[in-house]
Swiss-Prot record:
It is a multi-pass membrane protein. The lineage of its organism: Bacteria, Pseudomonadati, Pseudomonadota, Gammaproteobacteria, Vibrionales. GO terms for molecular function: carbohydrate transmembrane transporter activity; maltodextrin transmembrane transporter activity; maltose transporting porin activity; porin activity. It comes from Vibrio cholerae serotype O1 (strain ATCC 39315 / El Tor Inaba N16961). The record marks 28, 60, 92, 227, 374, 411 as: Greasy slide, important in sugar transport. This is Maltoporin. Homotrimer formed of three 18-stranded antiparallel beta-barrels, containing three independent channels.
Length: 412
């Protein structure tokens, strides 16, 4: 009886505390499965370049708790998040749970600027992404600290230092600086960002990778029927290789190799979502990416098998993705998505020129909690046609594949 009483008291205390603490439960997940024509279960190809709808063959989950604690004019936010991903092939799967976020953000500490926020810990730091391709084009997340939303006239300045990797020779870091809310014309604003990735060498060690710089300009245009965003990014060294590919940009800088020291690259992106009438909405991505002296070939035997050969390549590619959606009512919609990504790796120093390309077309019948393009949760059944334009054996013995599947996506 005593044990029951203790449990009952704990439950009662928890329920009573609910009125005193406003804990925010938030998260995101996607999960589903598909059947492909070649019998290899679900298939997915290059979603950053051709679109993610009907083109994801994994499950991914993240859930977090956050609470704001107020004292006087100050607000202290404690934020946490756990993330995990797997293939979804079995009902019970082993997988590492990652502490994606655990940080404290304090607003109101500066009497001269009550909106400025000081923070420290592990954090998704002001990430920038294109939703329909799941492409994070600026992402310097990690463990660190900084201050954000400092008032500089009408603009907002944010600076941060974030650790980015550690190896036997060095420890990597990102210095991130951003200036946002730069007013232009009506409903238009500009954000400028600079990420400098550098390393500190350990005693008697030498880091062969050069530091890199990534600069970004993000133009946001509000429209009467939606929004449009244009992004230009330029990177050097390891950031040059990232900018020339759909690899994201910010963290996971290439250390321990000189392969990218001479690299430079840029990308031009345009994306947005617009309302095309009472029943239609459409999202899109347009992208052009290019780079030169991208390290491309490693060789050697034994302990030298990963030695950079000095042979590299130039690269250019483009991507077009459109996702129109027809709304039958407040819940049911039919969603189409077509995408094409193609380019070439141009020989430099003896490598052969290599063309590459993928195309995808998806039709999905979906039901969502609301009629907006962004309404979630959303249940989908879909059919997807995949094409590899350069590899005749991309899908078993064929260059095409068809997948039918079901998926749910939610955020809250």
């Amino acid at each position: 009886m005593k044990k029951v009483s203790v449990i009952a008291a704990a439950v009662a205390a928890t329920l009573a505390a609910g009125s005193a603490f406003a804990v925010d439960f938030n998260g995101y997940f996607r999960a589903g499965t598909g059947i492909s024509g070649n019998g290899n279960a679900d298939q997915a190809v290059n979603k950053a370049g051709t679109g993610r709808l009907g083109n994801e063959n994994d499950n991914y989950y993240e859930f977090g708790f956050a609470e704001e604690l107020k004292t006087g004019e100050q607000t202290w936010k404690v934020e946490s998040m756990i993330a995990q991903g797997n293939s979804g092939a079995n009902g019970w799967e082993d997988g590492d749970f990652n502490v994606a976020q655990f940080n404290v953000q304090a607003k109101g500490l500066l009497a001269s600027d009550q909106e400025a926020v000081m923070w420290a810990g592990k954090r998704y730091y002001q990430r920038k992404d294109i939703h329909i391709t799941d492409f994070y084009f600026l992402n310097t997340s990690g463990t660190g600290g900084g201050i954000e939303n400092l008032s500089v006239g009408n603009q907002k300045l944010s600076v941060a230092l974030v650790q980015d990797g550690d190896n036997t020779n060095s420890s990597g870091y990102i210095f991130d600086a951003r200036l946002a809310n730069i007013g232009l014309w009506e409903n238009a604003s500009l954000e400028l960002a600079m990420a400098y990735n550098f390393a500190t060498e350990k005693d008697s060690k030498n880091e062969v990778a050069d530091d890199g710089v990534l600069v970004s300009a993000i133009l946001h245009q509000g429209l009467s029927n939606g929004f449009n965003q244009t992004v230009f990014q330029y990177g050097t060294a390891g950031y040059g290789a990232q900018a020339a590919n759909f690899w994201g940009a910010g963290s996971y800088y290439a250390r321990g190799t000189e392969a990218f020291n001479d690299a430079s690259g840029f990308r031009l992106l345009n994306w947005g979502v617009i309302n095309l009438g009472e029943n239609w909405e459409m999202g899109h991505q347009l992208a052009y990416l290019a780079g030169s002296d991208i390290g491309g070939q490693f060789g050697g035997d034994g302990a030298n098998k990963n030695t950079y050969t000095g042979k590299s390549f130039d690269i250019d590619q483009y991507s077009v993705v459109v996702r129109p959606m027809y709304k039958w009512n407040d819940t049911m919609r039919t969603v189409f998505e077509a995408g094409y990504n193609a380019g070439e790796k141009i020989s430099n120093g003896g490598l052969a020129t290599e063309d590459f390309g993928n195309a995808k077309f998806t039709v999905a019948q979906a039901w969502a909690m609301g009629d907006s393009f962004w309404a979630r949760p959303e249940l989908r059944v879909y059919g997807t046609y995949l094409l590899d334009t350069e590899n005749d054996k991309a899908f078993g013995d064929d260059d095409t594949e068809f997948v039918v599947g079901i998926q749910v996506e939610a955020w809250w």
